């Protein structure tokens, strides 16, 4: 496996665990990072810096996926390769960053890798 799959969430560890369990995603992710401990929330740029520091990688080595346009925009402006997961065929909000790619679901991501 040449990629690490990491959740970076404003949610608590308990909430993230419940969502992972409920959606049968157990064992899919290599790591779960919650902002619960640092008390700084997305879209603050310090949040996006957490995985950079933890994994010692360059911003451009990081593909960031979100279904939230504000999150995609903030991550892209931070310097990540931001991908929009557009499950419902929505229109991307008029924000100052557009995603590098749009996918329908995480299966599409697997096909890209």
Show where each model-derived region lies.
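Catalytic-core regions built around general acid/base machinery
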Residues: 1-2
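Asp-based, Mg2+/Mn2+-dependent phosphohydrolase catalytic module
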Residues: 8-13, 17-113
């Amino acid at each position: 496996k040449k990629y690490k799959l990491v959740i970076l969430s404003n949610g608590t560890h308990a909430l993230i665990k419940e969502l992972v369990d409920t959606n049968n995603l157990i064992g899919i992710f290599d790591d779960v990072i919650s902002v619960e401990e640092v008390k700084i929330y997305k879209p603050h740029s310090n949040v996006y810096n957490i995985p950079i520091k933890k994994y010692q990688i360059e911003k451009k080595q990081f593909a960031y996926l979100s279904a939230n346009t504000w999150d995609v925009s903030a991550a892209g402006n931070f310097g990540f390769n931001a991908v929009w997961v557009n499950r419902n065929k929505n229109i991307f909000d008029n924000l100052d960053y557009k995603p590098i790619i749009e996918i329908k679901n995480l299966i599409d991501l697997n096909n890209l890798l």
